[in-house]
A protein has these predicted regions:
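Extended beta-strand/beta-hairpin segments
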Residues: 1-55, 66-154
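Alpha-helical metal-binding/catalytic segments enriched in His/Glu/Asp
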Residues: 60-61
Length: 154
């Protein structure tokens, strides 16, 4: 498909299959299931594409921070993150008459709490450098505004 050396580009490959109401997504070593683009039922246990998308963004950024801190020999005692996505025009997805605007994620916010014993300057430098090394963050910010706040907690 592409003739690019892996040192310059890594081709990630995935597969999906529809099985009844379930869409089975295959990763290299596992599979996950989803049932819809977005699920507006807070009680439902069925995962949606937006659920996986949101937690993948958050998980990718936390993973990048963890790896970057480890490379710099900076300890993270604990880390927790929260993500909010602003889903515009959701009624279009529900087929509500009179609503036909394209559904889109307008923007998002992430708040990450990190317990460490770093100075504020070093903490800020490490977190910003971690974002610069994050595939997911660097891709997402081209699609919609994503505000990320880091807070150091003791």
């Amino acid at each position: 498909m592409y003739n690019v050396p892996e040192s310059e580009c890594f081709m990630a490959k995935y597969r999906a299959v529809l099985r009844g109401e379930e869409i089975k997504l295959f990763t290299p070593n596992d599979s996950i299931s989803l049932y819809s683009q977005v699920n507006f039922d807070n009680q439902s246990l069925q995962k949606s594409a937006v659920d996986y998308f949101a937690v993948s963004i958050l998980g990718g950024i936390l993973s990048s921070v963890k790896a970057h801190f480890a490379q710099q020999r900076a300890d993270i005692v604990e880390m927790e993150g929260k993500i909010w996505l602003n889903l515009a025009n959701p009624l279009t997805l529900l087929g509500v008459r009179g609503y036909s605007e394209q559904p889109v994620i307008n923007d998002g916010k992430i708040k990450i709490f990190i317990s460490s014993d770093l100075t504020d300057d070093i903490f800020t430098q490490l977190t910003q450098n971690a974002l610069r090394c994050c595939f997911i963050y660097n891709t997402i910010i081209k699609a919609f505004p994503l505000n990320i706040e880091f807070e150091q907690v003791l």
